[in-house]
From Swiss-Prot:
Biological classification of the source: Bacteria, Pseudomonadati, Pseudomonadota, Alphaproteobacteria, Hyphomicrobiales
Keywords, alphabetical: Hydrolase
Name the record gives this protein: Deoxyguanosinetriphosphate triphosphohydrolase-like protein
Entries under Gene3D superfamilies matching the protein: Hypothetical protein af1432
BP term (GO), one: dGTP catabolic process
Pfam families, A to Z: HD, HD_assoc
Annotated InterPro entries: dGTPase, dGTPase-like, dNTPase_2, HD/PDEase_dom, HD_domain, PHydrolase_assoc_dom
Family, per entry: Belongs to the dGTPase family. Type 2 subfamily.
Source species of the chain: Rhizobium etli (strain ATCC 51251 / DSM 11541 / JCM 21823 / NBRC 15573 / CFN 42)
SUPFAM superfamilies: HD-domain/PDEase-like
Superkingdom in the source lineage: Bacteria
Molecular function in Gene Ontology: dGTPase activity
NCBIfam families reported in the protein's UniProt record: dGTP_triPase, PRK01286.1-1, PRK01286.1-3
Chain ranges of the HD domain: 75-219
Length: 405
């Protein structure tokens, strides 16, 4: 049966000239036949959702340890929220929604158990062997560590999806070849030897909307979780003019609203205003740049999808509030110290005795290795753990496991 692509409900004429074209991608590292019913970016998104790494996000920390309660966000719920915002932005700007969604869904694959605390601890123990970077780890997962296909390791994503993943925070190199944020992690350089991701250019606009969607979701939902936990109060939110304005708006319309509904009304307005701000900035910058292709977006001298100066200042104020009231809260700091101890202890135990990893694959690959490659394998194993698995593994090996409640 022949499929008429022109009659399918995607990839139509509404896509902007500067959008990524799902039918003429820059390919995959391992060539594959195309699908008659799905674009390459749809296939990327579907492959991402079916990975083990995606399922593990369910039990990885966003801010609060995954065992704290059913209503707090995990990496998985955060990822889904980012994907929803990215897709909305992509539709508004006439981009390829599947590419934007796929980049959003894969962006946190490399995160360790216990959030940034786990990443910092793993980076510390891996410093003698090159350190740890969650973006580079995400790339390793989708190009090497996921083992699902007969003909290759990884999930063989398109160049555009990998570019969006690697350039989540913008170009990694200056035009002169210097690192924009320090040395480029070696796994990224190694992959670029095989499939050059052009680290000195900006990513597609689809990848840019996925990145700014991450910021929008972080700020909004960390406030929501902070209020739920009691670490934040409405009075604290009043310190930020933008949030104070939203609260006044909600109170004026709903003067007797219960706290949970009041919170939701603030959050939905915050997301809406931030999304509209990004769309407005992108439209303005596109009107100046007048790009005629996705290549013109990459060659631009600045990011297109971003906050206005006023919203960027609000973003800084919100991050400062979250850092002060939540991330540096004494209770959270105690939990973070315990989480770091778990990661450090497990790394030392597995380096000393790889059989304690209780995985034939990892043990077989480590046998006889020198310390540097052994440490990288142990790091991969630890980074893939969920919060709950790391805690149970520590309890099996040690007499005392820190209380993370």
């Amino acid at each position: 049966m022949t499929v008429d692509r022109r009659a399918l409900g995607f990839g139509g004429s509404e896509r902007a000239v500067y959008a990524a074209d799902p039918w003429t991608t820059r390919g995959r590292l391992y060539p594959e036949d195309g699908s008659p019913t799905r674009s390459d970016f749809q296939r990327d998104r579907d492959r991402i959702v079916h990975t083990t790494a995606f399922r593990r996000l369910k039990h990885k920390t966003q801010v609060f340890i995954a065992q704290d309660g059913d209503h707090y966000r995990t990496r998985l719920t955060h990822t889904i929220e980012v994907a929803q915002i990215a897709r909305a932005l992509a539709r508004a700007l006439k981009l390829d929604e599947d590419l934007a969604e796929g980049v959003a869904l894969v962006h946190d694959f490399g995160h360790t158990p216990f959030g940034h605390t786990g990443e910092d601890a793993l980076h510390e123990v891996l410093l003698p062997y090159g350190g740890f970077d969650h973006n580079a780890q995400s790339l390793r997962i989708v190009t090497k560590l996921e083992r699902r296909y007969a003909e290759f390791d990884g999930i063989n994503l398109t160049w555009e999806s990998l570019e969006g993943l690697v350039k989540h925070n913008g170009p990694l190199l200056t035009p002169e070849g210097a690192g924009t944020r320090g040395p480029v992690p070696q796994p990224i350089l190694d992959y670029c030897e095989l499939h050059d991701l052009e680290l000195a250019t900006y990513a597609s606009l689809e990848a840019q909307v996925a990145a700014i969607a991450d910021d929008i979701a972080y700020n909004t939902h960390d406030i929501d979780d902070g209020l739920r936990s009691g670490y934040l109060t409405f009075d604290m939110l009043e310190e930020i003019p933008f949030l104070a304005g939203l609260m006044a708006e909600v109170r004026a319309r709903y003067p007797h609203l219960e706290p949970s509904r009041f919170t939701h009304e603030i959050m939905r307005r915050q997301i809406t205003r931030m999304v509209e701000d990004v769309i407005g900035v992108a439209q303005q910058r596109l009107s100046i740049l007048r790009p005629e292709s996705a290549a013109d977006i990459r060659a631009a001298d600045r990011v297109i999808a971003t906050f206005s100066d006023a919203m960027a200042e609000t973003d800084r104020q919100i991050k400062a509030l979250l850092f002060k009231r939540i991330y540096r809260n004494p209770d959270i700091m105690r939990i973070r110290a315990g989480a770091a101890q778990i990661v450090t202890d497990l790394f030392a135990a597995y380096m000393a005795s790889p059989k304690e990893m209780q995985s034939h694959y990892w043990v077989d690959h480590i046998a006889g290795l020198a310390d540097a490659p052994k440490a990288r394998h142990v790091g991969d194993y630890l980074a893939g753990m969920t919060d709950t698995y790391a805690i149970s593994a520590h309890r099996r090996l040690f007499d005392h496991t820190p209380d993370l409640r």
